[in-house]
A protein has these predicted regions:
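A short helix->loop->beta-strand "cap" motif at the edges of active sites that frequently abuts
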Residues: 206-210
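Generic structural signal for well-ordered alpha-helices
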Residues: 195-199, 241
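Second-shell loop/turn segments in exported
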Residues: 148-152, 180-189, 202, 227-234, ...
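Conserved SGNH/GDSL esterase-like catalytic core that processes O-acyl groups on lipids
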Residues: 101-193
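Alpha/beta-hydrolase-fold catalytic nucleophile elbow
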Residues: 176, 214-215
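Catalytic His-Asp segment of secreted/periplasmic serine-dependent ester chemistry enzymes
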Residues: 219-299
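N-terminal secretory targeting modules
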Residues: 1-110, 119, 123-124
Length: 299
């Protein structure tokens, strides 16, 4: 009898232990389910909040529009659906500042241009804006601006870009950087990060100045086939310009779509505007560029 009682005690103990484990598992499943439901609710709230802010990549909105720009547009902003993705990117062509009453070239006497050799052309050619102020340096990107690198101007003088720009005290700043650092077909995340930081630094140094972000200019189709310029192809430049347009809106800057006047029907740099290298621009191209700038201001 004692053996039976011991055996029964062991069986009951095992049964109760098994039942305890089952109950504990059920409780754990219920807890995890509750946590999952709570996470979904909170996550949905964060997504909804994000959709009300300026973001570079965003879920499709109910009417497929994006109306967060700080200036009037000729048409509603639409977004592009990214291939094999539910996310979308802002179309830089739709985010551009619309045409305005043209200003005289003399208006740019109180304006500064920040850029690389493409901007130096604006300074050097008579068809550009030689009467404006410039912080233009061959071969630079936004990282040189952020890091306070000493840069050499077209006349050979070396200076720190932000210091030089601040000393000019312009009423507006026009920025065009990217062609020199995007030639390699690599990830451009760091370029965008530096670009954001650069705009922040300009805004802090010149709080009253309006900032115009110019799109990276188009190139001839053969440029992207060259090993040292594989990243300068039409499709990639469009994606980067989408990002720059979103950054401009995020930073309360104005975005200018230079492709309106420099690109042909295929989205390539107009052949008659192209220098032999396929991405630098001839004087007649600068004339069209200047006409566009004169008719796209916030004055």
């Amino acid at each position: 009898m004692a053996d039976y009682q011991e055996y029964r005690r062991r069986i009951l103990h095992r049964r109760w232990r098994r039942m305890f484990i089952i109950v504990a598992l059920l409780a754990l499943v219920a807890l995890l389910s509750a946590i999952g439901i709570l996470w979904k609710v909170l996550h949905r709230e964060r997504v909804d909040t994000a959709l009300s802010q300026n973001t570079i990549l965003r879920q499709v909105t109910t009417d497929n529009t994006w109306n967060t720009v700080n200036y009037p547009l000729a048409r509603q902003l639409r977004v592009q659906t990214l291939e094999d993705s539910t996310e979308t990117a802002l179309d830089f062509r739709m985010a551009a500042l619309p045409a305005s009453a043209p200003v005289e070239k003399s208006w740019f006497a109180q304006v500064s241009f920040v850029g690389d050799s493409l901007t130096q052309g604006m300074q050097i050619y008579d068809t550009g804006l030689p009467g404006a102020q410039f912080c233009a340096y061959k071969g630079v990107g936004p990282n040189a601006f952020v890091n306070g690198t000493s840069c050499k101007r077209a006349d050979g003088v070396t200076e720190i870009p932000l210091d030089a720009l601040t000393a000019q005290q312009p009423k507006a700043v026009y920025v065009l950087l990217g062609s020199n650092v995007l030639g390699r077909d690599t990830d451009y995340t760091s370029f965008l990060t530096y670009y954001r930081l650069m705009l922040d630094m300009i805004s802090q140094a010149l709080p009253d100045a309006k900032i115009y972000v110019q799109s990276i200019t188009p190139v001839r189709p053969e440029v992207g086939t060259q090993a040292n310029h594989a990243g300068l192809n039409r499709d990639r430049l469009c994606r980067i310009n989408n990002e720059l347009a979103a950054i401009a809106l995020e930073k309360n800057c104005y975005f200018l779509n230079l492709w309106e006047v420099l690109a042909d029907e295929n989205g390539d740099l107009i052949e008659s505007y192209a220098q032999p290298d396929g991405y630098h621009i001839k004087p007649e191209g600068y004339a069209a560029w200047v006409d566009y700038l004169c008719s796209h201001t916030m004055e």
